[in-house]
């Protein structure tokens, strides 16, 4: 299947499908996010949890046009509809990063990646909702990025569900892939933000097996580091019986 998708994307590229891509900012992000502008409501694009919400959910995107845009892939049959979309972030170190890709057709994910490569952008390695900092670089190698975006610190009406840069530090005005004690998690489909009840926003919790010590007591030796021999009861010798 991966080979077929790669083959289809290669053919599409030579057929000048790149001309159907467009980068939009501001209010246009909310416009193209809505499923009324999808060619069909299928694939990962049609099943996205943010495909049928009010535009105010996207305030954090719309209000930060210098660092956030949306790459859309228009339908060849109907340019007023799209076949895919992906957020494009400008990280604090200046790199451009393409986030999770949502498409009607699986093969178009590779087309998005090819388009990103053509523009010198980095692309999320695993096309999922994981808060990972691994990405494909423009030369195709896998790299770990400094995944931090500087945004306006507040004043948003609602908040979107974020796939990757889901930790919002309100005081510092950043989105990142790493939790912190001052961070809120943007993983709510109702437009709210939350501080994780389990980790307090740190992104990690104490191990329940070792209570944070890093070691656990051996159930065979009761933590002594040794146990009595079952053959000699720890005496070191056994009774010899003549046959």
List the predicted regions and their residue ranges.
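Non-catalytic substrate-recognition and accessory regions of acyl/acetyltransferase enzymes
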Residues: 1-99, 103-193, 200
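Surface-exposed beta-strand edges and their flanking turn/coil or helix-capping segments
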Residues: 111-113, 232-233, 242
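Short loop/turn and capping residues at structural boundaries
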Residues: 126-129, 210, 232
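Cys/His/Pro-rich metal-binding microdomains
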Residues: 181, 197, 208, 219, ...
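Periodic glycine anchor positions in long extracellular repeat architectures
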Residues: 190-192, 199-203, 210-214, 221-225, ...
């Amino acid at each position: 299947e991966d080979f077929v998708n790669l083959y289809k994307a290669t053919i599409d590229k030579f057929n000048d499908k790149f001309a159907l891509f467009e980068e939009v900012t501001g209010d246009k992000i909310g416009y193209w996010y809505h499923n009324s502008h999808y060619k069909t409501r299928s694939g990962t694009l049609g099943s996205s949890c943010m495909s049928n919400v009010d535009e105010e959910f996207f305030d954090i995107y719309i209000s930060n046009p210098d660092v956030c845009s949306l790459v859309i892939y228009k339908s060849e049959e109907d340019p007023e509809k799209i076949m895919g979309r992906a957020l494009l972030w400008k990280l604090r170190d200046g790199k451009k990063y393409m986030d999770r890709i949502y498409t009607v057709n699986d093969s178009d994910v590779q087309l998005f990646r090819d388009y990103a490569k053509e523009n010198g952008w980095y692309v999320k390695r695993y096309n999922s909702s994981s808060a990972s900092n691994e990405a494909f670089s423009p030369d195709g190698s896998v790299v770990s990025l400094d995944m931090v975006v500087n945004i306006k610190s507040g004043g948003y009406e609602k908040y979107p569900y974020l796939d990757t840069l889901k930790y919002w530090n309100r005081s510092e005005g950043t989105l990142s892939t790493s939790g912190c004690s001052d961070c809120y998690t943007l993983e709510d489909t109702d437009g709210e933000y939350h501080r994780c009840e389990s980790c307090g926003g740190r992104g990690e919790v104490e191990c329940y097996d070792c209570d944070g010590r890093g070691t656990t007591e051996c159930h065979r030796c009761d933590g002594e580091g040794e146990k009595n021999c079952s053959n000699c009861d720890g005496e070191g010798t056994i009774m010899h019986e003549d046959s």
